């Protein structure tokens, strides 16, 4: 049923894209939008991981890396992937002070995971394991394809809505709704389509985040470390550390373990992620059910040693 709902929501995104095409070019524009949407989905299927990793400047790493933090990150991720019955994913690092992580790829055989330098510097080894187990859960559940295709279509809807705003009223009366009516429709689609696309993203992403938290805790064998990690990441992400690439590509925000957007404007009203405290509570309940002690509240400072070898942090 969860997969059925996801496919229905993806169909809704495609319908929104076609609606924007109709306002721009009538029936012809709608058909062109449909063909374009299908082409985007096919392109995303084969190139999703490459596009996202290139966008964020991800660098592939392995066990031979000279930095101990990165070596441990690779070793633990490979070990957990093996224990979860997954092929070895491409393991990458992105140069960002904001602590965060994501997974991408069309299937487990073509999956990639990424952790930011900020995350590796902030968290303990056990907490990093918890985060990467969450990302491996997305791979195991085959969420990565849906999440990347959703990002592609949602981003295209926003771009097409802006195009509709400027050109939607230029058709004549015989061209299916030109003039004032077409302009009003174009204005409405420019305002409402990105919001609708974001709401669909939220519906897809939120349910999958809870499930990835649950499966991730099983993969890591530890719900407490993931709960602490989420608390730390949330605190630091809201402490003034912007993810520049995510701000430029907001349609990819739902791919991260914590919303990477700064919360300016409407971002804080239309979050693509469940509230972190709700996720932590769910993990706490899971820990109690598994016989673990309840996760303690994370400290707002870290004793981890950054990649530079010097201690530091947002408030140091």
UniProtKB/Swiss-Prot annotation:
Q: Which Gene3D superfamilies does UniProt cross-reference here? A: Metalloproteases ('zincins'), catalytic domain (3.30.2010.10)
Pfam families per the UniProt record, alphabetical: Peptidase_M48 (PF01435)
Source taxon at top rank? Bacteria
| Transmembrane regions listed in the UniProt entry | 16-36, 149-169, 180-200
Q: Which cofactor does it need?
A: Zn(2+)
Q: Which compartments is it annotated to reside in?
A: Cell inner membrane
According to its UniProt record, the EC number is: 3.4.24.-
Active-site residue list? 135
What residue spans carry the region label Disordered?
A: 295-316
A Gene Ontology biological process term? proteolysis
Name of this protein: Protease HtpX homolog
Give the organism, scientific name.
Caulobacter vibrioides (strain NA1000 / CB15N) (Caulobacter crescentus)
What membrane topology does this protein have?
A: Multi-pass membrane protein
Query: What is a single cellular component term in the Gene Ontology annotation?
Result: plasma membrane
Q: Which family does it belong to?
A: Belongs to the peptidase M48B family.
Residues the entry annotates as binding Zn(2+): 134, 138, 209
